[in-house]
Amino acid sequence: MSETNWEEPSELIIEQIEIGPMQNFTYIVGSRSTREVAIVDPAWDIDALLEHIDEKDYNVTGALITHYHPDHCGGAMGGHSVAGVAELMGQRPVRVYAHKAEAAGVVKVTGISDSDIVKVDSGDTLSIGDVEVQFLHTPGHTPGSQCFRIKNTLVSGDTLFIDGCGRVDLPGSDTEDMYH
């Protein structure tokens, strides 16, 4: 697990953590003054993520899911079981935020209950302490893929990369949606 931490004298906590054999990025976002945080795409090593959060004296209250693929939220993948939101919820009482078009996929791959998911739509907001997260529906990689705008930062999951965009050759993906 490797960490990139952008230190800035602001209210925003944002930490990028590379995790898992696919070198996914998980983010810890939240409020510096309240120490309240959410984990974006909690998958692979939930114990290490929670240990890191505890070391920083953060209080994790939510999980923000960009899309339902197991490498981003946990579940069965290629004959392996990836730890994710189900394991996180087993250790901490968090709320799971997924786009309304993605909720059924999150339930299917993770095994959590539909009632465990807060279904959001594009433009909805969430306050994490004194920091506001705006949900942005960005279909293409999956029908309910979403990004998160936090102050002047975009957390994009598998929608956007430095050198391209997420795959559009997977079941449920749509090239036209990705490029609009």
Show the residue positions of the predicted features.
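Metallo-beta-lactamase
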Residues: 125, 132-137, 142-180
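Conserved beta-strand hairpin/beta-sheet module of binuclear metal-dependent hydrolase folds
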Residues: 4-58, 147-157, 162
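Short, function-defining helix-loop hinge/capping sites that tune catalysis or transport
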Residues: 26-28, 49, 75, 79-80, ...
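Short Gly/Pro-enriched turn/cap motifs at secondary-structure boundaries
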Residues: 17-18, 117, 137-139
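Short Pro/Gly-enriched beta-strand edge/turn motifs at strand-loop
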Residues: 7-14, 105, 130-133
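Active-site HxH/HxHxD metal-binding segment of metal-dependent hydrolases
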Residues: 34, 45-132
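Active-site flanking residues adjacent to catalytic metal/cofactor-binding acidic residues
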Residues: 40, 66, 98, 136, ...
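Accessory terminal helices/loops
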Residues: 1-9, 13, 173-180
